[in-house]
Amino acid sequence: MTVLLAAPDSFGLTLDLALAGLTVGSAAALSGIGLVVCHRATGVLNIAQGAQAMAVAYLLRDLVVVRHWPVWPTLACCLLVVAPALGVLLDVLVHRPLQRRGAGPAETMVAGLGVFVLLIGVAVLLWGPAPLAGAPSPFGGAPIRLPGGHTLRPDTVAQLAAILVLGLAVAATTRWTRLGLHLRAVVDDRRLAALTGVDADRVSALGWAFGTFTAGLVGVALAPYLLLDPYGLPLLVMETMAVAVAARLRSIPVAVATGLGLGIAQSELTRLRPSGQLLPLVQAVQSNLFVIALLAAALLAGPGITGGRAPDGGAPLTSRSHRPGGGRGGGRGGGGGGGRSAGAVCLVLLLLPFGFRGNDLRSALLVPALALVLLSVVVVTGYGGQTSLGQAGYAGLGALGTALLMSGRVPGLPALPAVPALLLAVLATAPLGLLTGRPAIRRRGLALALVTFAFGTALSRFVFQQPYATTGLTLDRPALLDGDRAFYLAELLLLGLGLLAVRALHRGRLGRALTAMRDHEAGAVAAGVDVPGLKLLAFVVGAALAALGGGLMGLAGRAFDAASFDPVRGLLWFAAVVVAGADSALGAVLAAALLIGLDAGTVTGVSAVAVGVLAAAIGRLPGGLAALPTARRDPPPDLPPGRLTPTGRRLRATLNRRP
């Protein structure tokens, strides 16, 4: 197989492609600056940056194209007023309560995902899910002529100028101003800085304002080259986190150099034109180079990347983690009456579709399938304490594997019926859980979340969206299950088996070992628990459950749809599980029913808004909805009576003597 070049190697062509790559590279560099500065000031990785960029880009287009506002005043209003105000609002309502409660990186990340999902849901409600064209380009115009006949776009020049100005401004502010001194103090120790008189909340608010400003700048810069898509643009900007991770969330020069370098490399790869079937793969590498970079950067960064001021990992995302002394039954919906009530509600919701017809019944077919996918999140995150954002990828592998086996597209195997194909796809996908389980041995929290997110995104781009996965596949149900009600009954039986398997996993010695690993990994190691083996087991079981659910989703729709397993949907599913209660199996079933029911019964985007609001409010809802019955039943114990110091006793006596 030979690889041909699009044109003879020449310095002129190389320079032209490098100049073209500066457009995307400069946007990635701006994204890196915003992420690094925001992390310096707040200690939090702005994981919602992509959604913030999308929101500002949509608002600018709506005001300029639809309402015919003038471009430059509108641009100034969006970037200098709306975007910073959004950042301050998010700091006050979302992140500040988490900081005051001393939440760990896991809860902080979930709150950021809540903001991400919420903004996407709002965009879908306001502007619809269909992509929109015609985003305004403030710096549009004739290309700038350079010596030698080369050209450079005016907006690229503007972005490079913004990088220079922002970089110098941040460096000058950090080194030579009082604000920079306060910033360094807050970064070193927020509580100690507050005790010395530093307004840590003000520093944090400025950090979030700057982060959303740069996010808006990135969205405005990229929107003219793309169709505005409420799912595509946030994911594209999120992929540029690679430059900040490569800089270890500390070095602005490294982030800028990485962003520009990746942009140029992505452009230079367009010269490759391999012959044969390699062309789609090479094109996928060229268009998704930032995904590869994010995966590589997250793996090379190791466990040192954190998303908050607490040590990496923090408290587990469970309904038990906030309760004094733990308590029993946390993983079963809160135990007692709360667990029985949740079970009754789930049973009613699962039986209701037997009275549905037509489109309502076809929509309900997705509920048991999605519940199995969400159960995989419960096993990995709720029971195992490992933050995995890539379960949608395993669900897609289950659906794609079933379709390939049924279509006779697997070498050496004939076309299989639906049931054997589904079971074989699950068995083949389960060991692939080791691909994310191995990195989990040395990583927790945000470091692991970035690896699993990049892995799921890579599966979506390099596997699900390739031509072989989108053409010529069949997913016909067995004759006995061809009817929607019969197929729904079969799904319920498989869901019941999945719930029994998860319940068995959570009981006995294995369940106690998983709980020990989740609650305190170092203590579990000291007690002789095989922590690496348990992590691998959690990911393998999670991959199998997700693959089973994904295969059922494909059979329910009678087709493989790559969009159903988009990484953004995976983020929504993860946030929904945490909101329902990360260690609650019944909560996963309830979350699946609500996700499907809200979108099918109302307007697309309502479920994302609901999940986003609850996830963003995780600081006020520790443990999720599953913890509410326990929180009401078991209020926190009274604090022991305080004991005054000698100075306090003298002050009390003085105050008591006053008339």
Question: Which ranges hold each PLM region?
Answer:
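Short amphipathic alpha-helical coupling elements at transmembrane boundaries
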Residues: 96-100, 184-195, 515-516, 526
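Transmembrane alpha-helices and adjacent helix-loop boundaries
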Residues: 3, 12, 24-27, 31, ...
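Membrane-interface helix-loop junction between the first two transmembrane segments
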Residues: 37-51, 181-184, 312
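Alpha-helical transmembrane segments and their immediate interhelical/interface regions
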Residues: 67-93, 208-218, 405-428
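C-terminal ends of transmembrane helices
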Residues: 33-42, 88-98, 243-247, 376-381
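Hydrophobic alpha-helical bundles that form the membrane domains of multi-pass transporters
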Residues: 161, 168-248, 252-255, 262, ...
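Alpha-helical membrane-interface segments at transmembrane helix boundaries
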Residues: 15-23, 95-99, 246
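Short, hydrophobic transmembrane alpha-helix segments
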Residues: 5-18, 36-45, 62-74, 351-362, ...
